[in-house]
Amino acid sequence: MISSNDFRTGSTIELDGDAYVVIEFQHVKPGKGAAFVRTKLKNIKTGSVVERTFRAGEKVPKARLERRQMQYLYSDGDDYTFMDVENFEQITLQRDQIEEQLRFLKENMNVHVLTWNGNLMGVELPNTVELKVVATEPGIRGDTATGGSKPATLETGAIVQVPFFINEGEMLIIDTRTGAYVSRA
């Protein structure tokens, strides 16, 4: 059991027979009445996001997710194949199970495959990944005065906002949790 006071971003809980990960949480202490914790929870199986409020100190069952280190090998239509790096066992996940992670997933990348109660739940990417810019507009001299940004298409097809000084062919470090540019590689 985990107390609602101990919720952190990334905490996993069991609710209504499903596993959820805490995306956002906020402790609220109103002037009148008891404190409570407002959360945004993501269903690990379906990917849907729900908002839920818990009383401060309320006990909730902790979802025990098993994380296995695997390597992404290839895709075949809507099937994505991963290999366990320890015993070389291969598993296949459907596109709808890993839809959000596809933006930053590239071949031979090491990831964690999540299982809960023996069921494959999804993929957890590293916090940052190194990706190549395949298309972006050239930065025009003097554009940086406002510190703006421009869209860039990465090798995985994801489009992220990058500073004006980034050019095609450069390797970037991208935060997979937010989809934001971090730095040049």
UniProtKB/Swiss-Prot annotation:
Q: Which UniProt keywords apply?
A: Cytoplasm, Elongation factor, Protein biosynthesis
Q: Which GO terms describe its cellular component?
A: cytoplasm
Subcellular location per UniProt equals: Cytoplasm
List the CDD domains hit by this protein, alphabetically: S1_EF-P_repeat_1, S1_EF-P_repeat_2
> What GO molecular-function term can you cite, just one?
translation elongation factor activity
Give the GO terms filed under biological process for this record: peptide biosynthetic process
Does this entry carry the keyword Transport? no
Q: Which domain of life is it from?
A: Bacteria
**UniProt-listed SMART domains:** EFP, Elong-fact-P_C
Instruction: Give the transmembrane ranges.
Output: none
Q: What is its main location?
A: cytoplasm
The biological pathway it contributes to is: Protein biosynthesis; polypeptide chain elongation
Please report a single Pfam family linked to this protein: EFP
Q: Which family does it belong to?
A: Belongs to the elongation factor P family.
Q: What does this protein do?
A: Involved in peptide bond synthesis. Stimulates efficient translation and peptide-bond synthesis on native or reconstituted 70S ribosomes in vitro. Probably functions indirectly by altering the affinity of the ribosome for aminoacyl-tRNA, thus increasing their reactivity as acceptors for peptidyl transferase.
Q: What is this protein called?
A: Elongation factor P
Q: What is the lineage of its organism?
A: Bacteria, Bacillati, Bacillota, Clostridia, Eubacteriales
Give the gene that encodes this protein.
Answer: efp
